[in-house]
Structure formats: C-alpha cells, structure tokens
C-alpha cells in the first residue's frame, strides 16, 4: 500500500511539473504574439498618418492650383 501511495504521489508531482512548464511556455508565446501585434499596429498607425499627411498636402496643392486660375 505504501508503494502505491509513493508512486501515485510521484505521478501527480511529475504531472504538476509538466503542467506548469506547459503553462509557462504558453504565457511566453502569448507575450510574443502580443508584442508582434503591438508592433504591427504601430506600423499601421504610422502608415495611416503618412497617407493622411500626403493626402492633405495633395489637397492643399490642388486647392491652391484651382485658386490661382
């Protein structure tokens, strides 16, 4: 009976250790994905602001050209 208890505790302990390792790896992967998403959203924001600035400059130039005629 004592042998059965020891082996059961060993199995439970090893299962908990492997579970905690898997959870840690999962958290690391989620953190990496979040960083990549943040970087991509920053790039998109920068791209949109550049497009907006170019469109505003083109609009001003077009209005200036129409005003001169």
From Swiss-Prot:
Propeptide feature ranges: 23-43, 68-69
Q: Where is the composition biased (Acidic residues)?
A: 30-40
Q: Which residues form the signal peptide?
A: 1-22
Query: Which coarse location class applies to the principal site listed for this UniProt protein?
Result: secreted
Q: Which portions of the sequence form the region Disordered?
A: 24-44
Q: Which UniProt keywords apply?
A: Amidation, Amphibian defense peptide, Antibiotic, Antimicrobial, Cleavage on pair of basic residues, Secreted, Signal
The residue stretches assigned to a coiled coil in this entry are none
Point out residues bearing the modification Leucine amide: 66
Q: Which GO terms describe its cellular component?
A: extracellular region
- Where does it live in the cell? Secreted
Q: Does the keyword Signal apply?
A: yes
Q: What is the name listed in the Swiss-Prot or TrEMBL entry for this protein? A: Dermaseptin-H3
Task: Tell me which species this is from.
Answer: Pithecopus azureus
């Amino acid at each position: 009976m004592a042998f059965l208890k020891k082996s059961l505790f060993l199995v439970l302990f090893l299962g908990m250790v492997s579970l905690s390792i898997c959870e840690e790896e999962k958290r690391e992967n989620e953190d990496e994905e979040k960083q990549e998403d943040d970087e991509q959203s920053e790039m998109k924001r920068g791209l949109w602001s550049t497009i907006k600035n170019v469109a505003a400059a083109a609009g001003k130039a077009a209005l200036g050209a129409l005003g001169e005629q």
